[in-house]
Amino acid sequence: MQNGKDDSKMKLKTIICLTLAVILALSCLAGCQGTENPVPASDPPATKEPQGKPEEPVPAVPLSAVINAKALGFSAFDNQLVEYLKQAGRADENFTVSPLSFKAALTMAALGAEGETQAQLLEALGFRSVDEMRAWYATVLAGVDRFDAFFTEMEKEAAELAEYFPDAANSQERTAAYWVVNSVWSNQDLPGEFRQSFLDEIAKTCYAEAYSAKAAELANAVNAWVNEKTNGLIPSILDDASDTSAVLVNALYLKTGWEDGFAKLGDRDFTTRSGEKVQKPFMEQTAHMAYYKDEQTQLVSVPLQGGVSMVFVLGEDTGLADKLSKAEYKLVDVTVPMIDVETTLNQKELVNYLKLLGCEKMFTDTAEFDPMYTDPLCVADIIQKAKVHTDEEGLEAAAVTAIVMNATGVLREPETPEIFCADQPFSFYILKDGASPELLFWGQIVN
């Protein structure tokens, strides 16, 4: 409830910060079974010249269409990625993507690159230097710490309350979780290993773990790690990695509840982009939250616990940050469908996107990853799997991004509430708080 104009503005600013960070999406390649325990990577010297050059896929979207994309209000990299995927054939389908997971994996690649390869990566990511990139990743980890601190404080308060009211004590274990974790993997049966200086760098900057496995077990080992780090939401990311020299993997997982719970409404009509009506399970809540409406856009920012918000947008979603800054804290009756969307992206989209931004050298046999590995490597594929699920209780989402690196360089294929009713195509954003909020997930529901 509002306790005056100043309190309302302060609370609104907090919600806006939380809202500007949860839009990232996840994608993954299928395949996986059990695995033997992976062993930590070591660093013996070896040399092997890469053979051949990865096939150059033809970009499906012109660079001008991406660079001139209308800003959503986040970083240029995030904005252009969303616009590229829309124009590359996904405009009329439900999909989600995780810019944060993608950028985190590319951060490890940039830390292991040098020369033109590193310069192209930094420019694409929007960083002027490696130090600026390190500073950005530190803000990502700080957001994770704030999420944990929120629930730690709640548990502390609950424990203190239980001393006076033991019958009211809640002994349930914490189910909310948010983490951004990284690992790197080398193939024991192929020449070369990660350099210790690189492992030290990514451990310090990204808290990354290093492993190695035999060729036949590499995919299973990576998939087992992915399954664990996403709480089973994404069971696998690789099919076969027997010819893969190294893999850089990021995993992001988020689970939290709504600050005010939704009520189930049952199945209702949802009008798709083509005008067809389909049945979807809907939910509803009425509460005070950030709300904005103009002739082109209607949006509402629904808060979740732990400094996270989910922004639902009807109509035009350009200039989101500016519109959120103009949002008012109002009583809103929100009716939205439950979301269950999963997307897989690979080199046809992610590699093409990076090439449009000028990242060419990392995909060729002249890629400069000597600071990372004792053998020459190039990027053979980039794959991501993202999944977002919402219901009346809250949100669960995960993303995994894997950068596959080969020596051969062969690519693999009582107020009156405002009414917000998303019974037609809409986009959504999942945001984490911070001075420069991160877009964890973006998605659209059109069918």
Model-derived segments and spans:
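Short, Lys/Arg-enriched N-terminal segments with co-localized hydrophobic residues
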Residues: 1-9
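Structural recognition of the beta-strand scaffold that forms the well-ordered cores
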Residues: 96, 104, 183, 310-313, ...
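Conserved structured core elements
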Residues: 71, 75, 99, 115, ...
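Detector for small/aliphatic-rich hydrophobic stretches
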Residues: 5, 16-17, 24, 28-211
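Non-catalytic, conformational "gating/processing" segments within enzyme and secreted inhibitor domains
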Residues: 92, 131-314, 325-412
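C-terminal soluble interaction/assembly domains
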Residues: 386, 392-447
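Bacterial Sec-dependent N-terminal signal peptides
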Residues: 11-15, 19
